[in-house]
Amino acid sequence: MTGNIVARRYARALFALGAKSGVGELDKLGSDLAALAGALDAAPELGRIFRNPIITAGEKRNVILKLVEKYGVSATVRNFCLLLADKGRLDCLSDIQAFYGVLLDAEKGVIRGELMTAVELAEAKRAQVKAALEQQAGRKLELTFSVNKDILGGVVLKVGDRVLDASLRAQLGILKDNIKRGE
């Protein structure tokens, strides 16, 4: 819980700094953070280094500097990462990137969601479903599509903290419960 609060504060601070320069800078900062967070996710040993209290802040600075050089991130993100190293918060980088993405989506008016189906949808059908959902939501929608044969048929749509379960499995479960109750 505390890590999330800390990550949110740092993400808001970086977002406010980028907002002064415009949406283009916000996008650049977001992509730089995503690259670094992706590197941390791909190499769990880096996360262990950043969480280890025995390793000094100077050593962590050296590690993050090498990572920053490798990915060629902006000076703002470089300085931000050095600040995180000095404050002992490099272990929060992935959480910071995730919340920064939420802030960026809110700024752009984008909502993210996941559409789960029992079978793979053709690209034309995906575009059609996405367009219909965008029209209904009145906002731009970034959808990820996944396949889960366990739902048997229909769709499960997750957007934010809302879930619309229109799957055959859910409908059969409701029918089963109704039969048990005698309805």
UniProtKB/Swiss-Prot annotation:
<dbReference type="InterPro" id="IPR026015">
    <property type="entry name" value="ATP_synth_OSCP/delta_N_sf"/>
</dbReference>
<dbReference type="InterPro" id="IPR020781">
    <property type="entry name" value="ATPase_OSCP/d_CS"/>
</dbReference>
<keyword id="KW-0997">Cell inner membrane</keyword>
<dbReference type="Pfam" id="PF00213">
    <property type="entry name" value="OSCP"/>
</dbReference>
<keyword id="KW-0472">Membrane</keyword>
<comment type="function">
    <text>This protein is part of the stalk that links CF(0) to CF(1). It either transmits conformational changes from CF(0) to CF(1) or is implicated in proton conduction.</text>
</comment>
<dbReference type="GO" id="GO:0005886">
    <property type="term" value="C:plasma membrane"/>
</dbReference>
<keyword id="KW-0139">CF(1)</keyword>
<comment type="similarity">
    <text>Belongs to the ATPase delta chain family.</text>
</comment>
<dbReference type="InterPro" id="IPR000711">
    <property type="entry name" value="ATPase_OSCP/dsu"/>
</dbReference>
<keyword id="KW-1003">Cell membrane</keyword>
<keyword id="KW-0375">Hydrogen ion transport</keyword>
<comment type="subunit">
    <text>F-type ATPases have 2 components, F(1) - the catalytic core - and F(0) - the membrane proton channel. F(1) has five subunits: alpha(3), beta(3), gamma(1), delta(1), epsilon(1). F(0) has three main subunits: a(1), b(2) and c(10-14). The alpha and beta chains form an alternating ring which encloses part of the gamma chain. F(1) is attached to F(0) by a central stalk formed by the gamma and epsilon chains, while a peripheral stalk is formed by the delta and b chains.</text>
</comment>
<comment type="function">
    <text>F(1)F(0) ATP synthase produces ATP from ADP in the presence of a proton or sodium gradient. F-type ATPases consist of two structural domains, F(1) containing the extramembraneous catalytic core and F(0) containing the membrane proton channel, linked together by a central stalk and a peripheral stalk. During catalysis, ATP synthesis in the catalytic domain of F(1) is coupled via a rotary mechanism of the central stalk subunits to proton translocation.</text>
</comment>
<dbReference type="GO" id="GO:0045259">
    <property type="term" value="C:proton-transporting ATP synthase complex"/>
</dbReference>
<dbReference type="GO" id="GO:0046933">
    <property type="term" value="F:proton-transporting ATP synthase activity, rotational mechanism"/>
</dbReference>
<keyword id="KW-0406">Ion transport</keyword>
<keyword id="KW-0066">ATP synthesis</keyword>
<keyword id="KW-0813">Transport</keyword>
<protein>
    <recommendedName>
        <fullName>ATP synthase subunit delta</fullName>
    </recommendedName>
</protein>
